Amino acid sequence: MNKKTLKDLNVENKRVLVRVDFNVPIKEGIITDTNRIEASLTTIKYLIDNNAKVILMSHLGRPKGEPKPEFSLKPVAQKLSEMIGQDVKFIDSDKVVDDSVIEESKKLQPKEIMLIQNTRFRKEEEKNDQTFSKELSQLADLYVNDAFGTSHRAHASNVGVSKFLPSAVGFLVQKEIEIMGKALENPERPFTAILGGAKVSDKIGVIENLLDKVDTILIGGAMAFTFIKSQGKNVGKSLIEEDKLDLAKSLLEKAQEKGVKIFLPVDFVVAKEMTEESDSKVINIDDFTDDIAGFDIGTKTIKIFDEEIQKSKTIVWNGPMGVFEIEQFSKGTFEIANSLVKSKAITIVGGGDSASAIAKSGNKDKVTHVSTGGGASLEFLEGKVLPGIDCIDER
């Protein structure tokens, strides 16, 4: 990796400003999922162990550029204190950063931690405003980006601030880039991509980029119906993107030209309605009637996908196989998760829904890597440059 990493910086006695991703779900003041906080602990602990003065910043939710108490990071400071076993000073300012906040950063002693208020309380954050970036930079001597999940966005707290301070990536971002980068650039083969989710339009860039890299693509989720319909088959009232039929057809043709095997589902779990109560059954792809829709891949498809997964040496999975939030349409997604774990391959799970699914299936610790970025991991798989990483100092 050609970017500076945390270990390239001398952090002793320095104020280090770290962009973390503490965008966690909070219900009635209680954090319901601490994964993103956990993901940042390696970097924070390293800084404490090396006598740095630690200043943390993050966004939370979408307060639309103004202070809103329900989006305060105060509960996060309390939870982080518990998790790390030491006090985290929460500096609550509606302006996020002002003279008093800068003063607090100057009072910090080595090994102490402070967390500033939600960066999105300022509308300048999402505009990557130069003045706000400069204000943030006055909190510290060094800047570290450890928020992979926001690295596909160019905001003040992850891109703007890097123009004013020496910078590096933290351990979480480093791990994301190294693991996913190796999979894309130098994979052990056979290399299989499993793609799901509702829309082809969300995954076009990923498919186009992966056609030059993978040996096999397994397509599930509702996006499969657009591909199947592009071959002239009836899919009942299943979700399709009419304006993407020609594109789906051309992607299948491109795959054939490049010698990439694409597997589409051969059977589906179908029902008249997408509810827990609706009667569901498994049908073959040729047996669709106009009054039903597919909401999960069927048992034959699971078996075919599993056989391909077991042959693979590298696997990237992004997007669920069905509506896994509803129990009767969740089997495909959870069986694929189990199949990944059973394989002897390097297994990388993209962020967002796939990360939730792997966690829900109890297999989070049994795959090689679960990405912390939904949109960021998608854009990385598309081969796009991520601004939050691009701006970091070169080694």
Curated annotation (Swiss-Prot):
GO terms for molecular function: ADP binding; ATP binding; phosphoglycerate kinase activity. Its EC number is 2.7.2.3. Signal peptide: none annotated. ATP binds at K203, G294, E325, G351, G352, D353, S354. Its main location: cytoplasm. The keyword Nucleotide-binding applies. This is Phosphoglycerate kinase. It comes from Finegoldia magna (strain ATCC 29328 / DSM 20472 / WAL 2508) (Peptostreptococcus magnus). The lineage of its organism: Bacteria, Bacillati, Bacillota, Tissierellia, Tissierellales.
